[in-house]
């Protein structure tokens, strides 16, 4: 059994059995037909993934690995906020007529800040510290910029990464304010696991743990039947993560720098509606 499947099943069972519904509340998200999109949720879920032991991708259904990589590079490498720079259409619902999602995600990572060593954006500061100040307890990014929230098409869900070096190993904490368990949970886990591998490799470190802290872990009402079917699926073995070991510059990684060997997820034909 894939460990990611085990964690996902445990989280979803806990939410369905012990979670709290918001059907008595007025909610912002809605379905395409205008119906309010209500959820059942659990507060404060924390999951740990040892990236040395296994790559945490679901086998209960396919997580589209290359599309995950595309979005990761769009945000962290290109530092873009325009969907025309991104393969696929996952952000189309939040983009304006020019393709912009406002001052969100990649935009925030591209903003330069003044440091004693000079001007750097958040990504470059992380890369600098991992190489020059690995013992620092100040290596982090945060894209939840209150000053710019009013100009964001969507407030950041996964908003902060804290990196910590222990010996020759890079660990990280991903903080997430909100998590759609069906549509996005494993998507985010896969992306930020790859990010830890990338940061570790270019810094001469080993990838260690990814700790995922979720404030509001929820299942939408129209997702419940799909989740229940997935809980009955038989998990498959986790695949092997492969990364181009010759890349030493963070900005030289491409979608082709990564692959999975032995990834055989269960068939999945359900269409997943997305609340917006």
What residues fall within each predicted segment?
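Terminal, non-catalytic protein-protein interaction segments that mediate quaternary/complex assembly
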Residues: 1-276
């Amino acid at each position: 059994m894939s460990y990611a499947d085990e964690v996902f099943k445990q989280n979803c069972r806990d939410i369905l059995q012990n979670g709290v519904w918001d059907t008595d509340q007025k909610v912002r998200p809605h379905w395409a037909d205008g119906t309010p999109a209500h959820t059942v949720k659990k507060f404060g879920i924390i999951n740990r993934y040892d990236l040395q032991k296994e790559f945490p991708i679901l086998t209960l259904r396919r997580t589209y690995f290359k599309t995950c990589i595309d979005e990761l590079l769009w945000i962290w490498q290109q530092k873009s906020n325009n969907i025309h720079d991104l393969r696929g259409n996952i952000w189309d619902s939040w983009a304006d007529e020019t393709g912009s999602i406002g001052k969100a995600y990649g935009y925030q990572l591209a903003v330069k800040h003044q440091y004693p060593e000079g001007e750097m954006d958040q990504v470059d500061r992380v890369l600098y510290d991992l190489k020059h100040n690995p013992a620092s307890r100040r290596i982090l990014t945060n894209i939840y910029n209150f000053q710019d929230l009013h100009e964001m098409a969507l407030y950041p869900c996964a908003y902060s990464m804290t990196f910590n070096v222990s010996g020759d190993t890079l660990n990280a904490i991903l903080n997430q304010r909100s998590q759609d368990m069906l549509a996005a949970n494993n998507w985010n886990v896969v992306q930020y696991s790859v990010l830890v591998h990338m940061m570790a490799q270019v810094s001469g470190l080993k990838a260690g743990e990814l700790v995922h802290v979720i404030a509001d872990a929820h299942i939408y009402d129209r997702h419940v039947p799909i989740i229940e079917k997935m809980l009955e699926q038989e998990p498959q073995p986790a695949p092997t993560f492969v990364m181009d070991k010759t890349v030493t510059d963070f900005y030289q990684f491409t979608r082709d720098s990564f692959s999975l060997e032995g990834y055989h997820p269960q068939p999945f034909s359900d269409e997943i509606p997305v609340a917006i």
